[in-house]
């Protein structure tokens, strides 16, 4: 497979191994056993191929080290190591010794040896195979076991670097950090050029042991902190002001950072849209393209970087223009809702940005050390570190210089205010409480917390100042005086003194009640936050409300009608058409005349009455005759009479089980619509031809999706006729 670099050079190609099924299954079994212990043996600095770890943590660590060194005005260097053909060059003996070093037993090691002993391969190029040749190094890309073997081998290098006292890292608070990894991508944080020299010497020795060779043409270095204006280029390395790694462009230049991480991707999305606009996609087809191809280009960036509001607006405009080719037909707040409420399940970008940021709470309170965790503790040091998230704070009272983490604090506070249905324990916490201030500033006294004085009732308002102070001192309060104690008690407003306190909630102070549910950010993922946030923003569509009003239906009936869109047909165009009917976004002459697109609003068929949706599909004399013929057609097919009201025609028979009648009704409306566009009256003979054609289409899709049995059951009446 060719990489994005210059295709004229062989080193820019990578091989994907085609492995026989038996070997692949056996390899997968061994891989499954190794993955069970990876979290224990692989340091949290490695974010690649270890379950539960996120690549964005490595990217965020690099950004935070850059910010920290700049704020503290301390020198630093980022070294981005690129290994030449890393997966293809690792030495097998070294790999097996690494497994032994980490305590894997002889049985598992023998299995790995079995996969690599007497290994031969050939190259398939343009359908032509070379003769087989013996392999002597490397792990096969395409083998389930390969990534785990590689990161175990790479961990030996990381352990060596972390243990070397002469190779210094960047100190953030009291913690020293030297590196982050993502599979074979290694980024090092060092304070000076001497450490870079030591690392390069170590890497040369590591090459001899492991076979992994540094690619000096792609390895980059970057001056950071107080050295960021340095223009020197020592040691023959590529020194850059702007480096791309881990899917993110790292630079101190804000303009370049926005352009390369956001607006360049916007150009790619525009190009993709131009290509897909030529394909004549259905509405649901476009939704699929948006969710599976266009937005994934940005979702990772949203989770790692601060996203400008202007960019979100531009991206929304591009996406909705692609979807509707003009003015929105469904309100955006309805479009992001679930199909059962008349929505399209589109991703709400603003909500996704917030949910992906809130998902960092789970990572903050998980185990392990990382530069980004140390950085946020440093930022919140005056407020007790991450303890602040448990408090009833106001972001305005917290001087947090990082926009990324300030937004996290703001959105977490907003989430609790919006969704908490009863006061949480945070309202009772004294410290950093926006309602408890001295000299118009919130308070945080670590010595009080060490003495167990955390909640308002711990200030003992059932006693006077002197009695309560003496009681607190007897329970361990140190390094405080009576005036400070009295000041804290006086700062508590009367309405907070009467709040009910459930001290057991201190076991998980971040948790709050949302109706009958408990929301605990420590276990919540991006998906959970998104569902919660979008539930408050999403609205029921206008089409949903109109169906209720026009036909006097209950919410459950309208929901059922919209959900049947997913099963009415396997063909996206038919599904999309039925959705448009239900959503009242089909443009008949009556609607076109109202917006000034046509002068004559009369029916295309009868030229007498205004062409409303109801008239076109049911009330017109031409359409009415077609439905009579349709009922005869259905009787001949099924032997059953069917009555068709306006509701039945527009939304289908809600109690129909097999789905064939509803499918025929939808295709019949499709036939009426296409006849209108051709200025021809709907005709039962032409409809039968359409059904025969659609039968072939549905059968083809069923074969492709391996759903022939379901297809046969639905179409039995038609097949037997």
Predicted feature residues:
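Basic, alpha-helical interaction scaffolds
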Residues: 236-307, 358-365
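Conserved, non-catalytic sequence blocks in retroelement Pol enzymes and Pol-derived host proteins
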Residues: 17-24, 47-57, 69-72, 84-89, ...
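Conserved pre-catalytic core of RNA-dependent polymerases
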Residues: 1-156, 160, 582, 642, ...
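Short Cys/His-based metal-binding microdomains
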Residues: 593-649
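Extended C-terminal regions of large enzymes
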Residues: 315, 328-586, 668, 676, ...
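Short, conserved catalytic/metal-binding micro-motifs enriched in Asp/Glu and His
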Residues: 14, 82, 99, 112, ...
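Short, conserved micro-motifs composed of acidic
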Residues: 127, 199-200, 214-243
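Catalytic palm active-site di-aspartate
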Residues: 14, 46-48, 62, 76-86, ...
């Amino acid at each position: 497979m060719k990489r994005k670099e210059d295709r004229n050079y062989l080193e820019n190609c990578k091989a994907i191994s085609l492995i026989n099924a038996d070997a692949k299954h056996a390899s997968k079994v061994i891989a499954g056993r190794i993955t069970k212990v990876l979290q224990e043996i692989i340091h949290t600095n490695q974010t690649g191929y270890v379950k539960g770890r996120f690549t964005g943590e490595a990217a965020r660590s690099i950004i935070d080290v850059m910010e920290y060194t700049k704020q503290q005005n301390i020198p630093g260097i980022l070294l981005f190591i690129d290994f030449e053909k890393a997966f293809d060059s690792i030495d097998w003996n070294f790999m097996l010794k690494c497994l032994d070093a980490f305590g894997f037993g002889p049985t598992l090691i023998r299995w790995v040896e079995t996969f690599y002993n007497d290994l031969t391969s050939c190259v398939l190029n343009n359908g032509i195979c070379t003769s087989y040749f013996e392999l002597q190094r490397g792990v096969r890309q395409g083998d389930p076991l390969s990534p785990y073997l590689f990161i175990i081998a790479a961990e030996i290098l990381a352990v060596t670097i972390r243990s070397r006292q002469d190779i210094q890292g960047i100190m953030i608070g009291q913690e020293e950090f030297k590196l982050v990894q993502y599979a074979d991508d290694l980024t090092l944080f060092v304070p000076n050029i001497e450490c870079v020299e030591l690392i390069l010497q170590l890497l040369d020795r590591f090459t001899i042991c492991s076979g992994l060779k540094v690619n000096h043409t792609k390895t980059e270095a970057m001056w950071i902190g107080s050295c960021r204006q340095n223009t020197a280029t020592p040691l023959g390395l590529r020194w850059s002001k702007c480096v791309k790694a881990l899917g993110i462009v790292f630079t101190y230049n804000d303009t370049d950072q926005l352009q390369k991480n956001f607006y360049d991707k916007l150009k790619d999305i525009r190009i993709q849209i131009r290509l897909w606009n030529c394909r004549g996609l259905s509405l649901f087809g476009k939704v699929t393209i948006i969710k599976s191809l266009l937005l994934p280009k940005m979702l990772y960036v949203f989770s790692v970087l601060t996203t400008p509001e202007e960019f979100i607006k531009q991206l929304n405009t591009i996406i909705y223009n692609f979807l509707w080719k003009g003015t929105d037909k469904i309100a955006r707040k309805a479009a992001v809702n679930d199909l059962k409420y008349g929505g399209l399940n589109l991703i709400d970008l603003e909500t996704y940005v917030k949910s992906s940021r809130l998902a960092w709470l789970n990572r903050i309170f998980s185990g392990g050390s990382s530069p980004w965790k140390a950085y946020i503790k440093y930022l919140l040091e005056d407020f007790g570190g991450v303890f602040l998230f448990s408090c009833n704070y106001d972001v305005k009272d917290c001087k947090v210089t990082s926009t990324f983490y300030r937004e996290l604090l703001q959105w977490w506070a907003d989430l609790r205010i919006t969704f908490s249905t009863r006061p949480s324990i945070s309202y009772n916490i004294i410290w950093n409480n926006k309602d408890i201030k001295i000299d118009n500033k919130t308070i945080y006294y670590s010595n009080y917390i060490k003495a167990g004085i955390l909640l308002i009732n711990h200030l003992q308002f059932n006693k006077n100042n002197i009695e309560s102070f003496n009681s607190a001192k007897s329970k361990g309060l140190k390094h405080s005086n009576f005036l400070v104690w009295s000041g804290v008690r006086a700062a508590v407003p009367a309405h907070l003194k009467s709040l009910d306190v459930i001290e057991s909630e201190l076991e998980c102070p971040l948790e709050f009640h949302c109706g009958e549910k408990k929301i605990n950010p420590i276990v919540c993922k991006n998906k959970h936050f998104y569902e919660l946030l979008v539930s408050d923003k999403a609205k029921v569509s206008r089409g949903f409300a109109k169906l209720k009003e026009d036909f006097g239906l209950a919410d459950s009936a309208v929901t059922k009608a919209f959900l049947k869109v997913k099963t009415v047909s396997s063909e996206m165009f038919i599904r999309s058409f039925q959705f448009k009917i239900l959503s009242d976004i089909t443009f008949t002459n009556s609607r076109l005349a109202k917006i000034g697109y046509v002068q004559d609003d009369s029916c295309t068929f009868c030229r007498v009455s205004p062409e409303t949706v109801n008239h076109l599909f049911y009330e017109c004399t031409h359409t009415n005759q077609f439905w009579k013929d349709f009922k005869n057609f259905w009787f001949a097919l099924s032997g059953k009479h069917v009555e068709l009201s306006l509701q039945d025609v527009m939304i289908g028979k809600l109690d129909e089980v097999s789905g064939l009648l509803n499918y025929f009704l939808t295709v019949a409306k499709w036939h009426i619509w296409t006849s209108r566009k051709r200025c021809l009256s709907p005709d039962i003979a032409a409809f039968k031809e359409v059904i025969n054609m659609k039968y072939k289409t549905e059968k083809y899709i069923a074969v492709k999706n391996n759903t022939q049995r379901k297809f046969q059951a639905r179409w039995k009446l038609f097949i037997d006729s």
